[in-house]
A protein has these predicted regions:
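Conserved polar/disulfide-associated segments of primarily extracytoplasmic proteins
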Residues: 55-189
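N-terminal targeting sequences that direct proteins away from the cytosol to non-cytosolic compartments
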Residues: 11, 15-67, 71-72, 161, ...
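Generic serine detector
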Residues: 5, 13-14, 20, 33, ...
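Sec-dependent signal peptide recognition
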Residues: 1-9
Length: 212
């Protein structure tokens, strides 16, 4: 997921970069990646594979995302698994990913930065963003996002230059907590409840993802 400083670079650029289709393959609850990284990513057997998308994000990064969900019979999403492979294009040699989260976790011997947040469905979305792409993919397959969600973002940097990353975002419907995104955000009347919800969410996310 690109940082805001990197996104600003695109406005002075007329670069057009082409991509082919997705490189990684998904079978059931498993993604197999032959490179960057060479890995097998396993999710719970209860997930449904929604599909994949690949495009050049803001003209500067080759992105390939795969979406999985756990949903009710009416296709209301209860849990979202968003797996994304991302690298800056060669035409932008000075760009690199920057993460400063003090929290880390290990999955399959890989070190991941850990961030969490809550989000309401009605919040504004950046045009052309990876979120716009994944939500369009979900809608096209008939799935509905919850009114409020909580997310864990796990990011593993693949190279010393910090130009390539594996990002896994796990999201859950907030409804079972009894709180809304606005209530749990800083300044909200239930923000003091967020630390425990946050810790439990990270634990669940870490337990649902296996990398070999």
């Amino acid at each position: 997921m690109l940082q805001a400083s990197a996104i600003l670079v695109i406005f002075g650029s007329s670069l057009l970069v082409q991509t082919s289709g997705p490189e990684r393959t998904a079978r059931g609850n498993v993604i197999v990646s032959a490179r960057e990284p060479k890995a097998r990513i396993e999710l719970p057997k209860t997930v449904e594979y929604v599909g994949a998308d690949r495009w050049v994000l803001y003209g500067i990064a080759d992105c390939e995302l795969h979406a999985f969900v756990e949903a009710d019979p009416n296709k209301n999403i209860q849990r979202l698994y968003w797996v994304q492979f991302e690298s800056y294009v060669p035409e932008k040699p000075t760009l690199k990913h920057e993460y400063n989260s003090p929290r880390h976790t290990d999955i399959g011997g890989m070190d991941f930065y850990v961030d969490t947040w809550v989000r309401a469905k009605a919040e504004q979305m950046r045009p052309g963003s990876d979120r716009e792409h994944i939500e369009a993919l979900l809608r096209a397959k008939g799935y509905q996002m919850p009114v409020n969600m909580m997310y864990v973002r796990l990011v593993h940097l693949l190279d010393e230059q910090k130009r390539k990353e594996l990002m896994i975002i796990y999201g859950e419907d907030l409804k079972p907590t009894g709180f809304t995104a606005a209530e749990l955000k800083e300044g909200g009347n239930a923000h003091d409840r967020w630390p425990k919800i946050d810790r439990d969410l990270i634990d669940r996310a870490s337990g649902k993802i296996r990398i070999r």
